Amino acid sequence: MPSFRPKYLHSASLDFIGNRLRRRSLTETRSNGRRLELTSRIVSAYLSRNVIAPDELPYLIQQTYGSLNETSGPGETPPAVEEQRPAVPIKKSVTDDFIVCLEDGKKFKSLKRHLTTKYGMTPDQYREKWKLPSEYPMTARNYALQRSKLARAMGLGKSRALK
């Protein structure tokens, strides 16, 4: 919703409009009356913090009412969600060199970061969603071995000698 500053219009100017909306709601159905009341309140709250041109007020009211109308359709049920199928067979998702993401079929050496950034999932949530065992790896075997060797070569994992 664009913010305009040429002429000032505050929430006090809405009294007339709010009363007009309330009068009209008496002849309409109860749900339309509720939407009109909510529209009046939302627009009033918006105008108490924002300044718009007077000629933009009808557009603001129309957009607000339309948004409420879209979100409160009577008796609408959400479409049935089809159970998601893995992008590759689970048995083929783990190899020595890479792990295949069951969400999108992409290959990774380490899957944890991809799951977190792209899907907002933890490894445990991923395992639960796809009904994987708790020991299902998130890192390719060869990559884990390579990292382990590198860490040992750097001296990690050994206790430090006291001086």
From Swiss-Prot:
Keywords: DNA-binding, Plasmid, Transcription, Transcription regulation. Signal peptide: none annotated. One of its GO terms (molecular function) is DNA binding. It comes from the Bacteria. The keyword Transcription applies. Pfam families: ROS_MUCR. One of its GO terms (biological process) is regulation of DNA-templated transcription. The keyword Metal-binding does not apply. Belongs to the ros/MucR family. Lacks the C2H3-type zinc-finger found in all members of this family. This is Putative MucR family transcriptional regulatory protein RA0938. It comes from Rhizobium meliloti (strain 1021) (Ensifer meliloti).
